Amino acid sequence: GYAPLKKAIAEYEGVASESVICGNGAAELVFSLCQAVKPKKALIPVPTFAEYEQALTSCGCEVEHVLLREEEGFSLQDSFINWLHRDLDMVFLCNPNNPTGISIDREFLFRVLRVCREMDILLVVDECFLDFMEEPGRYTLKAQLSRYHNLFLLKAFTKRYAMAGIRLGYGITENTELLDAMTQVTQPWNISVMAQAAGIAALKETAYVEEGRQMVFREAKYLKEELQRLGMEVFPSEANYIFFHGPENLFEICVEQGVLIRDCSNYSGLRKGYYRVAVRTHEENQKLIRAMRDGTTKAAVAHAEVLKEEEQA
């Protein structure tokens, strides 16, 4: 189904519409992929998007983790290749990664892709945040689809077009057997008429996307500099969010100031003190920095008063 939408996506991506599958958000496609493949064993680096593991365990799959280390900047290392073995059915990679925003070098992805093909492993690469990178064309694996039938790319409208809640994502692969199997396990009419219309209209908005990208580049630079000035340890995110390490009570401090930030301590492989903030308008970003500055100052003053009282007691 959804022929006009699939045709519009195919034209936008420069692929055949037979290679496109649409989903109720990229998350639905992750689940239908797992239901279709029924993997026994899968590999994911952590921290990463939690839905991969959720989808894998929902179909009884055993999940192996490769820990991305703080001292290595949470980037995927060459040693990841050594974790690939013939018992694996699937590997999930997110580029750039969520929540860290750290990208994976394309040459390295080629190596992973080749080894996966040799070992008959399906490689799923989530490119939902790729459009926020300065040169997305240098990172996408789209050109490899025709040669590698073990490759599945995930994309979403949510991030690129600020369409959260409309629920529209898509996948691209030249593995027709896989697409047929996914269609079998996907409920019919999974995409509303409104989501289809919004998707077709959004794909024509090239100027809006470029404008949004430029704003993200500009504001991400501002946020990174300001967060560093506040003493936070900022990681080199290439997405439309910033990942950093700060005081363990920063979430509560911000809430008191009327600002919500994402506490990342519930991500597998992360401890307390890691946060992710979205890159928003300049005014909102200023408000965030102000809330952090005022909040941490207040907290420091209160802490000093407690120490003073303890000394006097």
Question: Residue spans of the language-model regions?
Answer:
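PLP-dependent enzyme catalytic core of the Aspartate aminotransferase-like
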Residues: 107, 256, 266-313
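Active-site phosphate-binding strand-loop segment of PLP-dependent enzymes
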Residues: 64, 71-133
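Helix C-cap/helix->beta junction micro-motif
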Residues: 59, 118-119, 148, 230, ...
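Conserved PLP-binding catalytic core of the aspartate aminotransferase-like
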Residues: 217, 225-258
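PLP-dependent aminotransferase-like
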Residues: 3, 28, 35-93
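Short acidic capping loops at alpha-helix termini that bridge into adjacent secondary structure
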Residues: 16-20, 127, 149-150, 312
